[in-house]
Amino acid sequence: MALLVEKTSSGREYKVKDMSQADFGRLEIELAEVEMPGLMSCRAEFGPSQPFKGAKITGSLHMTIQTAVLIETLTALGAEVRWCSCNIFSTQEHAAAAIARDSAAVFAWKGETLQEYWWCTERALDWGPDGGPDLIVDDGGDATLLIHEGVKAEEEYKKNGALPDPSSTDNAEFQIVLTIIRDGLKSDPTKYTRMKERLVGVSEETTTGVKRLYQMQANGTLLFPAINVNDSVTKSKFDNLYGCRHSLPDGLMRATDVMIAGKVAVVAGYGDVGKGCAAALKQAGARVIVTEIDPICALQATMEGLQVLTLEDVVSEADIFVTTTGNKDIIMVDHMRKMKNNAIVCNIGHFDNEIDMLGLETYPGVKRITIKPQTDRWVFPDTNSGIIVLAEGRLMNLGCATGHPSFVMSCSFTNQVIAQLELWNERKTGKYEKKVYVLPKHLDEKVAALHLGKLGAKLTKLTKDQADYISVPIEGPYKPAHYRY
């Protein structure tokens, strides 16, 4: 692939779309900093001691304005950083330009092809002769996946000379991954093994990536320690819930200008993300129907006044369909053929396999009409009616809008900084094995406390008698690890 890495005047590598947007990006970063008190508190608390001095951090996470504040927090604490996005549509060009010019090596632009996406991931992991990063900030697990698949291929190559065969899988994206690994083996047959040996650990941002980590842990194939940031309360109950409540309608309205009030909306899945999406649609005046496999989540939905049905029950009646499950094959092409004309179909789960885009793209005679970037109308020849698909079935809130607002991302990203610090500071103690860990409750509470002042909140203080009565320390943590918020 004929992509060339560029360099700034100071010699920092990058590949972004438009460096002329760097000044614009810097202005928005400065606005976001005011809305991200957790990250700014990390800079104030840890910046003087430079705890990341000597650390090389690779990030694979949406290259947005909010992520820019995270990156510059890591560099303010002493780290060197290389970054790529974890989604082909989520990069904000001005954010990428500002960071590439001022702070870190960035390889990201909006509208990457899948080949370009994995090239960017490979570049973000490439630290030259040193072998790779010390730490990874991951979102969805693609950087982690590339290293694991690379190590597996190198072991096979060393054992019997076998190269990865891209034709061994029907998954077009995984074919690209295997091609990258195969081509790299010829010139450097131990690249990913050296990365594995150097790596201290990874902190994972989202549900889908965490699922991958737990699968590898169960299989005994996890190569380095991992911290599950997603299941911190101040991430999952805020980013996943309140963030989606904000960004779903933002993406819908930017993409389609549709009036949500009066529409019938189907939300597939009623976890934290689904709860936020359903609340947003209900508050906007839609009649919301939930599909669920879990009786507990289904019961929660009914207690919120929502109807719980199957997709087959409502596929021909609804106006808006949103997938939030983190699973695959939720809305198939046969479902889409039965939808009413101009029904809107979108996904807010991490990957693009909740909606059967391959089935849609290969349906005989189907016609794709691009209305604007990331908004396409697909017309079926046998019905002459069409559906509107947002962001090609990928994350619509980042593909069609700018994702979650700065404040809620400050909660998530403060967890990321704390997780990275924890891994780095304990790198020589043996505290973290090749397992998946969750941050302790007192750190979760610390993240929350850092954000209260911005909102004008003031905590009540326990007396010693009160603390003794409920058997908690006066300064916390206030809830047991198993408590459900």
From Swiss-Prot:
Positions contributing to substrate binding: T64, D139, E205, K235, D239
Gene that specifies this protein: SAHH
The record's free-text note on cofactor binding: Binds 1 NAD(+) per subunit.
Family: Belongs to the adenosylhomocysteinase family.
Swiss-Prot/TrEMBL cofactor(s): NAD(+)
Listed GO MF terms: adenosylhomocysteinase activity
GO BP terms: one-carbon metabolic process; S-adenosylmethionine cycle
SUPFAM superfamilies according to UniProt: Formate/glycerate dehydrogenase catalytic domain-like, NAD(P)-binding Rossmann-fold domains
Name of this chain's protein: Adenosylhomocysteinase
